[in-house]
Design a protein with these regions (language model features):
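Helical subdomain adjoining the active site within ATP-dependent kinase catalytic cores
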Residues: 1-161
């Protein structure tokens, strides 16, 4: 069912582990709400609806990837990093189940730039992010491979339904 699909996706998507239980429940619900529209559509209508939002797919994928990187590098830390908090908020916006609510690539770039200007971002916060990214490259690659394997298994199991 759609409920099962949403529940399993949220549970297995390691990028979401850094988010609160209440956020994950809300995200799961938004997936169900969005996918319900396809129940009354023909296969062709569903494909057309999905393809209408192809320009948001890369942004969605990159946002999941960066959330995974953040999880791998910073999950155990309790230190507040202004850049990280705001960047995570931007990424969350771009993984919205409803593609109409995701930012365009252009708007994402603009929003990203304002993280440096509007927030008066400290160079130390961004530098800390880059240093940890460099130090944890191997863990990041391993985590991405694990996530790919998990998603392939999910895809196979749901394809059989």
């Amino acid at each position: 069912t759609i409920d099962d699909l949403a529940r399993v996706y949220v549970k297995k998507c390691s990028a979401l582990t850094i988010l609160s239980y209440s956020f994950k429940k809300m995200y799961e619900s938004s997936i169900v709400t969005y996918l319900q529209q396809f129940l009354t559509m023909t296969k062709e209508e569903s494909i057309q609806t999905i393809l209408k939002y192809y320009k948001t797919w890369d942004n969605f994928s990159l946002s999941i990837m960066y959330l995974n990187i953040i999880k791998t590098i910073f999950f155990k830390e309790k230190k507040e990093n202004v850049f990280l908090l705001n960047f995570t908020g931007l990424l969350i916006r771009n993984i919205n189940a409803n593609p109409e609510k995701r930012l365009s690539i252009k708007k994402t770039k603009e929003t990203y730039k304002t993280l440096f200007l509007k927030l008066n971002l400290k160079n130390k916060d961004f530098g800390d992010f880059l240093n940890k990214f460099e130090k944890n490259k191997i863990d990041i690659i391993k985590e991405n491979k694990t996530q790919d394997n998990t998603l392939q298994k999910l895809q196979s199991s749901f394809a059989r339904l």
